[in-house]
């Protein structure tokens, strides 16, 4: 048995059928062992739930939950986070695609710190990468975590 800390992946979905397969495939390919994947759907009206059920049947690490009504992004994530059982929680948006070593890299850096983040490479729906002009943005990570995006 490994002494590595356990990592729960938490993601929330809402009408994400266009992206959720690629996202889940990238999470399932992580080089660091994943304890569980907790997915909470916010009552999607497209085929998202069917895709989630398909993945949950194939992979026992995946636990899926569906809201009866639409709760919104922050309450949905808060509820999903409370369901997670791992030592650490990694949050994923429904259109994220992770590099295979994302969790391994973060776990090698976190040590006794409370929070660890990684670099991201935003890309458009056609797959081309977006670049920014280097200006500092007024972003408060704790505000984003607890209150939502600015």
Regions found by a protein language model. Give the residues of each.
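Nucleotide-sugar donor-binding/catalytic module of glycosyltransferases
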Residues: 1-150
């Amino acid at each position: 048995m490994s002494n590595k800390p356990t990592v729960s992946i938490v993601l929330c979905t809402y009408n994400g059928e266009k992206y959720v397969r690629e996202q889940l495939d990238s999470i399932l390919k992580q080089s660091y062992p994943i304890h569980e994947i907790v997915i909470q759907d916010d009552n999607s009206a497209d085929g998202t739930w069917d895709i989630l059920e398909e993945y949950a049947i194939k992979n026992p690490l995946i636990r899926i939950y569906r809201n009866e009504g639409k709760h919104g992004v922050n309450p949905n994530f808060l509820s999903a986070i409370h369901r997670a059982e791992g030592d650490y929680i990694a949050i994923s948006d429904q259109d994220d695609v992770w590099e295979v070593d994302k969790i391994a890299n973060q776990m090698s850096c976190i040590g006794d710190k409370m929070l660890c983040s990684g670099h991201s490479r935003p890309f458009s729906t056609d797959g081309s990468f977006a670049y920014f002009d280097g200006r500092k943005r007024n972003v408060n990570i704790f505000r984003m975590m607890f209150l939502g995006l600015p």
